[in-house]
Design a protein with these regions (language model features):
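Terminal regions of secretory-pathway proteins
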Residues: 2-400, 418, 423-743, 853-858, ...
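Alpha-helical transmembrane segments in eukaryotic/viral proteins
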Residues: 12, 17, 837-848
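N-terminal entry motif of extracellular EGF-like repeats
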Residues: 737-742, 766, 772-798, 819-837
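Repeat-scaffold signature, strongest for collagen triple-helical Gly-X-Y repeats
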Residues: 797-800, 809-810
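Single-pass type I membrane-protein transmembrane alpha-helix
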Residues: 841-867
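Interhelical loop segments of eukaryotic multi-pass membrane proteins
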Residues: 867-875
Length: 921
């Protein structure tokens, strides 16, 4: 009996455990509301919260019309393009919503600590969809035509057919080691002041800058082998493969406080604390603003929505660019940006150029469409602003040297496009564009892997980590890694020279263009346009050395004390930003990465001295960190002894080498892949060089054979006539391509069969099959046709700004402005022309005529009225005479002499009086 009672009690408890949560789950979990309605309301509230924070940020930026602070300039340079911004915003909505859900769930006693244990799968999918993240987490739909093997997609998607998101824009950076977040999921290293690492707190990043990293501008050592162009190329290529967007909001999501006004860690605010004394950088403030990088959708705390809130799904950061070496610096990484950059009116597949300015007949980059924070020439008229430049990467205006390289490639694309069109007149504008883009991408790969990376790694490390190309490997993930982007490839910051040198035709200091301090060229495109153009700057990059990375001279004070300084409104410290970014991303410590690269761990001061032979620097690092495991990977790798004939130590050589091999071997469109170019084309591509690019796109007539090798002019320079160049005859098509009305087709082969892939000219859409294949019975489908698109009806993505009127024309559209406005640089936005409207001149003329007419009419009326009054008075006098003469005769006769006498006297008086009156009138 007792056994039966015990069994019954057990069954009752089991049933209650199973059924009661099921019964109450819909009500009690959220205080009487249904699960779905309450959770959805939380998501909507979170969406409003994030939107409000972003709105406050935008409103603050719009009000800011004077000189921008360094923090605002950094935010501008980190501003993602619209697609990346949408992904970031969706992730932030999810991040904020899950925090709210956690609070509700965790406050309930005896509830599971994971929302996934109490939220249904359908509801989780609904939440993900409402936040906006779900579409960006699904695999992209890859095109199924043979063109998919001919040209890479602008987004980088579908490069790997089995893993279409590998290397694509707006996907998470790769993790080669698990992150080291303080909570295991999302919280940065150093977030909690009480959190200890091996018994010690992490040192403040600003203190590391001041004691270990910074050197005065006058104390830098110059590199005796490599030119300043080596440094610039590294920065340029970094911007081709990696861009981590900051939070879209500059205000805390909870409470909405401005991140520039708080020194507390409130997501997305992660401020850099100032030193307690003697810190010139932060005089008058307690901290420097810093914003966390956006999380990739579905990672970190957002993982709760996808059933994976755990340390196995930590917060990941997003790469807004394609990972591939594909010249996205020239063409962008999204269809929207690519559309802005192209010249759609040209039949030669050109890129847009600046419409207002030229450099001795050569093109400049176009300006951005709206007012930008770039500096203006002192004393310049506000009506003649020089905005930031528009390029494939938004950081093109950060520094003049970087702008110069962007400009060279704009010119090179257009040069190639014109030549290719001349060789193949039957090619459509899009075919010319794609072929020129393909060549430019290949040249980026060649210059980087053949000329740049071996100098950085040294020949031995290059052979060990990169080696010879053996063909495309579909099992290799080319995605840029977090440690490469956030730490290793930032070694180049230690090679930035504090001076910008501009040279004359003889490669001497220019008499009219003195050297500039680094902080004088930040966000200053006006200097390129107003001060001599591209050539003096390029001469300086070729003939002047880079800064040498020395252990006790790691970074010049132009970067640590005056980063992005355009006014007296503060500054930033690049070294501190790098260290804080590594902690934000949860990068494991220095020793973890040494172990990853099969290098020995450093456990003692003596061990550290072997990796860093400058004992003073090694001791400072140990005194600050207290333990080698605590050392931030960026600083540890930066301070290591160089490998032989290299510009990095063993750790960074390993990380950079592994990444470059992955970018090469995991890229289906790598230039050496025999399916991408013909053998003849590959031979021609190998001849080209950065020196040749400079010869073809500047006024320079002599250059070094190797543009990265510093030399003396003229003995180390070669005539451009002797610099090898591409013979584009290898791209001539020998067969005729028939014309297609308002479109074109491209020949290609698929499974050994001839195929035609059709495309329409810009402004037309395809109706029918995009690809037709030649079979035994003829073409498998009839050819498609191209129909005009009415772009003006596109309400989701209107072609013209709201300030302009859209007019559809055949194959295109026109944006029309009302006088006195005119089309801006983007040809879509109306801007003030600075003059009176034409209608104003007509109005003034008509007004003058009208006023003159009214004055004349008034004068005429007055004169006519005066004349009429005079004539009336004369008529009255005559009438009086007549009346007098016609008075009754009887009366006159009765009066006779007496009346006659009186009458005669009176008449004399009246005439006298009348004459006097007429005279007065």
């Amino acid at each position: 009996m007792k056994a039966l009672v015990a069994l019954g009690i057990t069954l009752i408890l089991a049933c209650s455990e199973v059924f009661f949560p099921f019964i109450w789950r819909g009500k009690d979990l959220f205080g009487g509301k249904t699960e779905k309605s309450h959770v959805l309301s939380i998501v909507e509230e979170s969406k409003v919260m994030v939107d409000n924070a972003i709105y406050k940020t935008m409103a603050r930026n719009l009000k800011k019309r004077e000189a921008n602070s360094p923090a605002q300039l950094l935010s501008f340079s980190k501003l993602p393009e619209p697609t990346s911004r949408a992904v970031s915003q969706a992730a932030e909505v999810m991040e904020t919503a899950i925090q709210a859900v956690k609070r509700k769930v965790y406050l309930k006693p005896k509830q599971s600590r994971h929302p996934t244990d109490v939220l249904s799968e359908d509801l989780l999918n609904t939440i993900a969809n409402i936040s906006g993240c779900l579409p960006y987490m699904l695999p992209p739909k890859c095109p199924n035509t043979c063109l998919a093997n001919k040209y890479r997609l602008i987004t980088g998607a579908c490069n790997n057919r089995d893993h279409p998101r590998w290397g694509a824009a707006n996907t998470a950076l790769a993790r080669w080691l698990p992150p080291a977040y303080e909570d295991g999921i999302s919280q940065p290293r150093g977030w909690s002041h009480d959190f200890l690492y091996n018994g010690f707190p992490l040192p403040p990043v600003r203190e590391l800058t001041r004691q270990v990293i910074q050197v005065s501008n006058e104390a830098v050592t110059e590199d005796d082998q490599y030119s300043d162009l080596l440094m610039v190329w590294g920065q340029y290529i970094d911007h081709d493969i990696a861009f981590t967007p900051q939070s879209t909001s500059k205000a805390a999501f909870w409470g909405g406080i401005d991140c520039q006004l708080t020194c507390e860690n409130q997501n997305p605010c992660f401020p850099i604390q100032q030193l307690p004394f003697n810190d010139s950088l932060t005089a008058g403030t307690d901290c420097l603003p810093f914003y966390r990088s956006s999380a990739a959708c579905g990672t970190g705390h957002q993982g709760a929505f996808f059933g994976n809130l755990s340390e196995s799904n930590p917060r990941q950061q997003m790469n807004g660019l394609t990972s591939f070496l594909d010249a996205s610096t020239v063409y962008g990484s999204s269809p929207a940006l690519e559309k802005q950059l192209r010249n759609w009116t040209s039949e030669e597949g050109l890129l847009r150029v600046n419409r207002r300015y030229q450099n001795e007949g050569r093109a400049y980059l176009p300006f951005v469409a709206r007012r930008s924070p770039c500096a203006q020439e002192p004393g310049a008229d506000g009506a003649d602003r020089i905005e930031c430049f528009l390029a494939g990467d938004g950081r093109a205006s950060e520094a003049l040297s970087l702008t110069a390289v962007h400009t060279l490639w704009l010119r090179e694309h257009n040069r190639l496009a014109v030549a290719l069109k001349a060789l193949n007149p039957h090619w459509s504008a899009d075919t010319v564009y794609q072929e020129a883009r393909k060549i430019v991408g290949a040249l980026h790969q060649i210059i980087t892997m053949r000329d740049y990376i071996p100098k950085i790694l040294g020949p031995e490390a290059f052979q060990e980590y990169v080696g010879l190309y053996e063909g495309y490997d579909a099992t290799v993930d080319p995605t840029v890694s977090n440690v490469f982007s956030t730490a290793a490839f930032r070694f180049g910051h230690a090679t930035v020279h504090p001076l910008v040198r501009r040279l004359d035709d003889g490669f001497q200091e220019h008499p009219d263009l003195p050297r500039l301090h680094l902080h004088d060229v930040f966000f200053s495109p006006w200097r390129l346009i107003r001060e001599g153009g591209l050539d003096p700057l390029v001469r300086g990059l070729l003939a002047r050395p880079a800064k040498l990375q020395v252990q006790h001279q790691l970074m010049n004070e132009g970067l640590t004390e005056k980063l992005f300084v355009l006014s007296n409104s503060g500054t930033l410290d690049l070294a501190s930003l790098n260290l804080q970014r590594g902690r934000d991303h949860g990068l494991p410590g220095y020793n973890e990465w040494r172990e990853f690269c099969s290098l020995p761990r450093l456990e003692t001061q003596a061990d550290l001295n072997t990796a860093i032979n400058n004992r003073s620097v090694a001791e400072k690092i140990m005194n600050l960190y207290k333990h080698p495991d605590n050392i931030d990977v960026w600083l540890g790798g930066l301070a290591e002894n160089f490998l032989p004939r290299a510009r990095t130590g063993p750790l960074f050589a390993c990380i950079i080498g592994k990444q470059m091999k992955a970018l090469r071997d995991g890229d289906r469109f790598w230039w050496e892949n025999r399916h991408i170019f013909t053998e003849a084309q590959r031979r021609e591509l190998e001849k080209h060089s950065l020196s040749r690019i400079i010869c073809d796109n500047t006024g320079l007539t002599r250059v070094p054979i190797d543009a990265f090798q510093v030399g003396q002019f003229p003995q180390d320079f070669e005539s451009c006539e002797n610099i090898p160049h591409i013979n584009l005859e290898a791209w001539r098509e020998t067969f005729h391509q028939d014309k297609v009305e308002n479109g074109d087709f491209v020949h290609c082969e698929e499974a050994g069969k001839r195929a035609l892939v059709y495309s329409c000219h810009h402004g037309y859409e395809l109706q029918g099959q995009e690809q037709i294949t030649c079979t035994d019975k003829g073409w498998d489908f009839p050819p498609p046709v191209c129909k005009d698109i009415n772009e003006c009806k596109d309400l989701m993505d209107p072609p013209c700004h709201l300030s302009a009127e859209c007019k559809n024309i055949k194959g295109s559209f026109q944006c029309l402005c009302t006088d006195p406005y005119m089309l801006g640089e983007d040809e879509r936005t109306c801007v003030d022309s600075g003059r009176l409207p034409k209608a104003s001149f007509v109005s003034i003329t008509l007004g003058g005529v009208l006023i003159g007419g009214l004055a004349a009419l008034t004068w005429l009326v007055i004169c006519r009225w005066t004349r009429s009054d005079t004539e009336s008075a004369l008529a009255t006098t005559d009438r009086e005479r007549e009346i007098t003469s016609q008075l009754g005769c009887g009366k006159c006769q009765e009066m006779k002499i007496s009346q006659q006498s009186i009458s005669t006297q009176g008449t004399d008086k009246d005439f006298a009086s009348g004459s006097q009156t007429l005279l007065c009138k």
